[in-house]
């Protein structure tokens, strides 16, 4: 017989939501930083071929 699960508490829900948002923030920050370093030519991890 199917039994409904207990409801997740609001505090647990907020913690999970905050972690999820924080992960997205750091990912976007890294992507922006990488894009910035590529555009200025200071990247040490990527070799971009320049068209002359």
UniProtKB/Swiss-Prot annotation:
Keywords: Chloroplast, Plastid, Ribonucleoprotein, Ribosomal protein. SUPFAM superfamilies: Zn-binding ribosomal proteins (SSF57829). It comes from the Eukaryota. Signal peptide: none annotated. GO terms for biological process: translation. Its main location: plastid. GO terms for cellular component: chloroplast; large ribosomal subunit. InterPro entries: Ribosomal_bL32, Ribosomal_bL32_plant/cyanobact, Ribosomal_zn-bd. Pfam families: Ribosomal_L32p. One of its GO terms (molecular function) is structural constituent of ribosome. It is found in: Plastid, Chloroplast. Belongs to the bacterial ribosomal protein bL32 family. This is Large ribosomal subunit protein bL32c. It comes from Arabis hirsuta. The gene is rpl32.
